[in-house]
């Protein structure tokens, strides 16, 4: 009997590892076990902090990134040549439309039907002028800063250019609509006001020529307007082609004012 205790104790000691594996006690609240990392686990790498404001192509500093047209990454001399060619094409298109093309259709049924409706363009300019103030950030984004293309320069800041051109658009569009509405209502305006529709049209013609660089800048530098919309180069090209149409229509409506000016200057 005395020899039985050591044998039982020996068996008990041998069974302790199995008992420990079968019955795991929960860890104490104050104690934590070290995590086991498998050999296949990848070590975590600290991520660089994200900038609060990331650069977006076509917006602000993002206009310096390569645009969809790729023009803004060309050498400055190449950019200048492309832009001057665009200006020349718009001018030539305006002259051709207002000259031989309008002359060919002037007096036709289509001309007589459509020509009286042209002052409706005043609504477009009036709305655009108001947008210069309500969407000033977007218009400023497509306004070329000084030094663009190596030659562009204005004495004012982009924001000021947005504001004063918006004011002129509101005046020109509203003045042209005022004259057209008076004619439609059969109201004779004082002669001192001059040819109201024509004066408004000439104002908008000059303004459209002045702001044309903004439309070209949107193409060359991919400048977004609205800020969250990236316009493809083909759409910009169509918009620039339509610039000639606008200029030709406004120049046609401005003829009475131009004739008055030539007469007053003794050129007629």
Protein language model regions, located:
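N-terminal chloroplast transit peptides
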Residues: 1-45, 53-54
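Membrane-interface extramembranous regions
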Residues: 55-268
